Each structure stands twice: as C-alpha cells, then as structure tokens.
C-alpha cells in the first residue's frame, strides 16, 4: 500500500507541475501579443540620402504614409537624409517632390520595399543635370531612375 500512495503522490506532483507550465506559457503568450500590438515588428534599418549635384538650389519635400519629412532646400553638394525601419509586410514607400524655384522637376518614389529592399540598405540618390540617379550598396554603380520633367 505504501508504494501505491507514493506513486499517486508522484503522479499528483507531476500533474501540478505540467499544469503550472501550461498556465505560465499561456500567460507569457498573451503578454507577448499585447506587447507586439503596442510595438509592432520592426524590419531592418534603411538609410536614404539625397544629394544635390546641380548648380541651382533644389527644393525637396519628402513623405511616407506615416511621416512628412518636411520641406528642404539643398545647395550644390548638400545632403538630406533620414532613417527608417522597413515594415514587416515590405510595403514601405517614401516619395519626394522636387522643384527649382517655380519649376516642378517631378515627384518620384525614393524608396519602395519591393524594389529597394535587396538593392540597398544605404540608398543614395544624386540629383544631377539629367535627372535622379540611384545608388545601392555598391556606390560606384549608379543608374538613372528618373528624368527631370523640366
């Protein structure tokens, strides 16, 4: 009889231990879901830089769906840049409007995750005479992405 009561006690302690682990796991899972709702998953950090290579002042105004980065005027050689985390759906999009005095040069997509996620973590754009050149993580190799409208 003594052996059977020891087995029952052992079984009871094991059951309590397993139930405790299940309850703690559920509580932790719920807490993690609440924390993720407050602070969603952040993708890798991306840096965008725009540099004016023209002899004139270049006005730029950049935005994303969530942020307005403001209006900036760049003299020749000046830079404007910002950093952001690509969202987990890879739908991050930033665009900028460009002008020279009253002349509209165009509105261009500066970053779209579907195009740029693997192209660059440090995306450099150079405003040159013919248009807007994009450089990826290999800075010596730029491409003309957009021609100026005027």
Curated annotation (Swiss-Prot):
GO terms for biological process: rejection of self pollen. The keyword Secreted applies. Coiled coil: none annotated. Glycans are attached at residue 122. The keyword Nucleotide-binding does not apply. GO terms for cellular component: extracellular region. Keywords: Glycoprotein, Secreted, Self-incompatibility, Signal. Pfam families: Self-incomp_S1 (PF05938). Disulfide bonds: none annotated. It is found in: Secreted. InterPro entries: Self-incomp_S1. Belongs to the plant self-incompatibility (S1) protein family. This is S-protein homolog 28. It comes from Arabidopsis thaliana (Mouse-ear cress). The lineage of its organism: Eukaryota, Viridiplantae, Streptophyta, Embryophyta, Tracheophyta. The gene is SPH28.
């Amino acid at each position: 009889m003594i052996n059977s009561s020891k087995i029952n006690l052992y079984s009871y302690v094991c059951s309590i231990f397993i139930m405790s682990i299940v309850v703690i796991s559920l509580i932790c899972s719920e807490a993690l879901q609440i924390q993720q709702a407050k602070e969603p998953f952040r993708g890798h950090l991306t840096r965008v830089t725009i540099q004016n290579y023209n002899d004139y002042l270049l006005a730029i105004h950049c935005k994303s769906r969530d942020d307005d980065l403001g209006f900036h005027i760049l003299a020749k050689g000046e830079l404007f840049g910002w950093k952001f985390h690509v969202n987990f759906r890879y739908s991050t999009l930033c665009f900028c409007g460009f002008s020279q005095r009253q002349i509209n040069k165009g509105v261009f997509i500066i970053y779209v995750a579907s195009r740029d996620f693997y192209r660059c973590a440090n995306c450099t754009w150079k405003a040159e005479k013919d248009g807007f050149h994009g450089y990826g993580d290999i800075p010596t190799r730029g491409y003309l992405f957009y021609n100026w409208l005027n």
